Amino acid sequence: MSVKLEVQRVARTFETTLNAGDVEGANAHFAAEFADRDNELGPLLERAARGELIGTVGNRTLLHLHLTDGETRVVELLWLELHGAWRIHDARVFSLLADE
């Protein structure tokens, strides 16, 4: 199976877990190193009403987060295979431009 399809499959599991309200389960997808230094994605997941996987390129995915306060964010997730499992190794968070 291609890297893109493997990553897309695990990202769908991440999305489903998040949408079930299982933030702890979603955080289990973080690589240990990322979990130690993350100060943005984890808090956003706690505020997420739902997430929507909107794209995959290689080992990167885009997730559209709809937050409980009505705001939204698009998050680029970098997935790396560690010890036989795909984990989130880094994330970049984008705010959508207002009125555009």
Language-model features, listed with the residues they occupy:
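Short solvent-exposed beta->alpha transition segments
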Residues: 1-62
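Exposed beta-sheet edge and beta->alpha loop/turn motif
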Residues: 53-100
